[in-house]
A protein has these predicted regions:
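Class I S-adenosyl-L-methionine
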Residues: 1-278
Length: 278
């Protein structure tokens, strides 16, 4: 008999009712920790965000929702998650400025910093219960400690067919996840999505995904060094190509042109495209 979500969460020692989790550390009911969206092309995709920046965050600086979360944890201040605070950080503007978003990210920062084991169990239970197949870690925030990296290492290792990806400035994380085939980690240099990248980034992703047994198709439209095909995110599958992932060469920009900046990697990508079209 198929297990219910309640059964799965119970196996991880967490009470689940009405799509809410009972958070023992804070004595409150909360939403599942991963936000499920549609930003990828296979299965259920999810994101994990924690409060960004590297300054000390004080309860007096926040609105009522965020302040209530901090009060529930019996803290008046907590350090942000990033190794540094970048000029022009996108988390300083837009939707990240709404108090409900700040409250959600603060909640997860508190849980990750102070209650790491509970957070690991809650995330693991949700991956299993919601059949999540791809996770972007840190839509906001970054790795902040060896223990926190270890939490994600345990999760990534447990779910070997789930794809995890992120950007980071935390060097320990780059080394820790080196042997995890299902974890794609890039130094924080470009704000690209998982399916887009330079030729070198595409080769890295292509090799790891194929080793995991996924069928990967690289779209040829980027090899012309012109504009991508119309709606190329979905175009390849629309013409009947069956695959798990479609990868695309990064659009040409002022600083990057496929084939000019990276002729060796570009040639290797073109070879793969030629072979897949035979």
């Amino acid at each position: 008999m198929k297990r219910t979500k309640k059964d799965i969460y119970k196996a991880y020692g967490i009470e689940f009712k009405g799509n809410k989790l009972y958070c023992d550390p804070l004595n409150m009911w909360i939403n599942p920790l991963l936000t499920i969206g549609t930003n990828t092309k296979i299965g259920n995709a999810a994101t994990w965000s924690i409060y960004h920046g590297n300054e000390m965050l004080n309860i007096s600086d926040f609105g009522p929702k965020t302040a209530a979360i901090m009060a529930a944890a019996n803290i008046t201040e907590i350090k942000g998650s990033c190794p540094c605070h970048c000029d022009g950080c996108y988390c300083d503007s837009g939707r990240y400025c709404f108090d409900n978003v700040k409250a959600g990210n603060m909640l997860k920062l508190i849980l990750a910093r102070l209650y790491t084991d509970w957070t690991r169990r809650a995330i693991s239970a949700q991956i299993e219960a919601d059949d999540i197949m791809q996770i972007r870690i840190h839509a906001a925030g970054d790795f902040f400690s060896h223990e926190y990296v270890g939490m994600w290492y345990d999760i990534v290792s447990k779910f070997g067919k789930v794809i995890f990806w992120t950007y980071t400035k935390y060097e320990y994380a780059l080394d820790k996840f080196e042997t995890c085939l299902n974890f794609f980690i890039t130094p924080s240099i470009t704000p690209a999505g998982f399916n887009f990248g330079t030729c070198a980034e595409l080769l890295y992703k292509y090799n790891k995904l194929t080793k995991l047994g996924y069928k990967v198709h690289i779209c040829a439209c980027g090899t012309t060094m012109q504009n991508h095909c119309a709606d190329c995110k979905h175009g390849c599958k629309a013409v009947g190509i069956e695959c798990d992932f479609v990868l695309f060469i990064k659009h040409s920009s002022r600083t990057y042109k496929a084939g000019k900046n990276d002729p060796i990697e570009f040639a290797a990508v073109c070879d793969i495209i030629a072979q897949q079209n035979n």
